[in-house]
């Protein structure tokens, strides 16, 4: 299954990519994470209870959303950052923010960091700093299941009648712009709107991260499919203002969470069949 492969990829990526950073002052008291894992906090920086403002969209499954059963914020980002702050002795203060403008707002110092399944790119590195990558995401085409006009990215590009949808301000939009002229791209404020347009027949495909695409396909198994090869493979990371003193401690916490199995537990919770919440549930 795609999601089990993704979970294994998650663990492998963290094993290869994360680099532990030493701290100055440490605490020896174990902390209990949301995942149920006991996290040893020795040899990690102690932020002394510092409040950390975290920008989240609350509209990007499975990273952050409002749980329809409880009305409370939930998702991978919340569990991961809560665990990070337990390790580092900090207090997360979550602030809902629109995706469009979120990265610039972090760059301007409005937030201490942002967590929204954000792709690490060199262009973004010019204005913000990133944590180490914590997951690798493939970009794919989502199409109607009965559409046989294309079976690959290239055959989609070669058909001048086909229009691709995506979300504005994303790396998916950038990828679409690299392969198609502007008049064959329709940008939406959020991916759910793009998928609705696809199902309605207003557009012919949506370029989307595979994690989200599989979620939409699962909910609409009789009407949607993923088509063709991966367009790109991107790493996701947390975003910080340039020069932030939080990057090193957060990277150290991520490395500790990879080592003690917390990240593997989160991968199992959010990137396998265990996660059943859909965008339809959020409506």
PLM ranges: what are they?
Residues 16-20:
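C-terminal motif of bacterial Sec signal peptides marking the signal peptidase cleavage site
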Residues 76-79, 94-104, 151, 186-200, ...:
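Short helix-initiation/N-cap motifs at beta->coil->alpha
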Residues 78-87, 145-147, 162, 170, ...:
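Extended ligand-binding regions for polar small-molecule ligands
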């Amino acid at each position: 299954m795609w999601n089990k492969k993704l979970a294994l990829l998650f663990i492998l990526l963290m094993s290869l990519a994360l680099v532990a950073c030493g701290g100055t002052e440490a605490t020896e008291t174990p902390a209990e994470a949301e995942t149920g894992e006991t996290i040893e906090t020795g040899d990690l920086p102690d932020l002394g209870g510092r409040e950390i403002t975290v920008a989240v969209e609350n509209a990007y499954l499975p990273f952050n959303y409002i749980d329809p059963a409880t009305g409370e914020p939930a998702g991978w980002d919340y569990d991961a950052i809560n665990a990070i702050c337990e390790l580092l002795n900090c207090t997360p203060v979550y602030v809902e923010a629109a995706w469009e403008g979120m990265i610039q707002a972090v760059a301007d110092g409005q937030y201490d960091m942002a967590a929204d399944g954000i792709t690490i790119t060199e262009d973004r590195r010019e204005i913000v700093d990133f944590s180490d990558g914590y997951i690798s995401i493939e970009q794919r085409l989502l199409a109607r299941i009965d559409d046989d006009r294309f079976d690959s990215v290239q055959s989609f590009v070669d058909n001048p009648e086909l229009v691709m949808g995506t979300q504005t301000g994303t790396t998916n939009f950038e990828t679409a712009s690299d392969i198609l002229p502007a008049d064959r791209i329709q940008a939406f404020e959020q991916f759910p709107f793009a998928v609705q347009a696809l199902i309605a027949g207003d557009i012919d495909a949506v370029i989307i991260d595979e994690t989200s695409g599989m979620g939409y396909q699962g909910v609409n198994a009789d009407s949607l499919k993923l088509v063709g090869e991966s367009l790109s493979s991107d790493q996701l990371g947390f975003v910080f203002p340039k020069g932030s003193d939080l990057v090193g401690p957060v990277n150290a916490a991520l490395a500790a969470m990879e080592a003690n199995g917390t990240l593997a537990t989160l991968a199992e919770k959010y990137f396998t069949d265990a996660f059943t919440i859909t965008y339809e549930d959020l409506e």
